[in-house]
């Protein structure tokens, strides 16, 4: 019998596979399908994770950039105190302006921004109150609630540091004496104040603002790897203070 005849006979054979061969084929197919499904699930999980991180980073940095830009635009003139007495750990109230002029004397281009963290809604809102008159350094603005309000951040929470939650806004003023050369403390002359500027006079000493919050993606999931912690510090100064024995400095100097 030739080889061709043998092959034709095998092809015409209706006995099929044996039970053992069939079981081996089924098990092999299941293993291949399970491996493919595992790769698909892992790929989808990683894609969703990267998307969430991207969303959280983009939305968080957009909000942070806006706040920092407004703080950096707050020194209208030398020795001006932009942080207002209504500021708290969850609300930053400051006067700023945008102009081509080196110093802004009239209230024409000035505005008051009220940046508020709403813990229940998880949002950061920025209400802009336009100037209604006044002259430097006393400006008049619209009443709160009458300005333009914009949601600049969603799915925002307080940053956790161990068991503690950091305030959204922290306020700094110049220490009276700089740290000595052999000190183990930070060399900066700016020290965090333990009280918010509840009085008008206290607001005039605030020379730096710390901003910290955690941004989650649109899904609202705050699991590890999906949310992003953002933390920065903005100084209200034109230059660094001199290292004199007693530091006598303030905001926008």
Where in this protein do the model-derived segments appear?
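Short linear sequence signals and composition-biased patches located at protein termini or domain-edge surfaces
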Residues: 2-5, 55, 159-253
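Aliphatic-rich helix starts adjacent to a transmembrane/signal segment
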Residues: 2-76, 245-253
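Short, ordered beta-strand-loop transition motifs
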Residues: 83-89, 118-121, 200-205
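Homeobox/homeodomain signature
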Residues: 29-31, 40-46, 54, 61, ...
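A broad, structure-centric signal for solvent-exposed, well-ordered loop/edge residues
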Residues: 8, 63, 78, 101, ...
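Type IV pilin-like appendage domain
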Residues: 89-188
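Generic detection of short hydrophobic beta-strand segments and adjacent strand-loop junctions
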Residues: 64, 115, 150-152, 228-236
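Short, glycine/small-hydrophobic-rich surface segments
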Residues: 48-49, 71-98
């Amino acid at each position: 019998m030739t080889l061709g005849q043998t092959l034709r006979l095998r092809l015409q054979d209706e006995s099929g596979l044996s039970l053992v061969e069939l079981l081996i084929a089924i098990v092999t197919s299941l293993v291949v399908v399970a491996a493919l499904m595992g790769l698909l699930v892992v790929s989808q999980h990683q894609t969703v994770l990267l998307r969430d991180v991207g969303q959280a980073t983009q939305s968080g940095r957009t909000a942070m950039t806006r706040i920092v830009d407004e703080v950096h635009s707050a020194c209208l003139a030398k020795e001006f105190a932009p942080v207002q007495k209504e500021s708290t750990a969850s609300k930053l109230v400051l006067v700023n302006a945008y102009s081509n002029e080196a110093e802004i004397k009239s209230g024409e281009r000035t505005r008051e921004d009220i940046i508020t963290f709403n813990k229940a809604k998880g949002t950061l809102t920025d209400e802009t109150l336009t100037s209604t008159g006044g002259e430097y350094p006393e400006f008049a603005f619209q009443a709160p609630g009458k300005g333009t309000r914009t949601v600049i951040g969603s799915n925002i929470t307080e940053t956790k540091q161990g068991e503690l939650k950091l305030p959204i806004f922290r306020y700094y003023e110049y220490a009276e004496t700089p740290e000595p050369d052999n000190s183990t403390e930070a060399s900066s002359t700016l020290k965090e104040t333990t009280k918010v500027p509840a009085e008008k006079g206290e607001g005039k000493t605030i020379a730096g603002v710390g901003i910290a919050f955690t941004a989650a993606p649109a899904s609202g999931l705050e699991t590890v790897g999906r949310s992003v912690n953002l933390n920065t510090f903005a100084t209200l100064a034109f230059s660094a203070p001199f290292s004199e024995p007693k530091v006598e400095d303030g905001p926008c100097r």
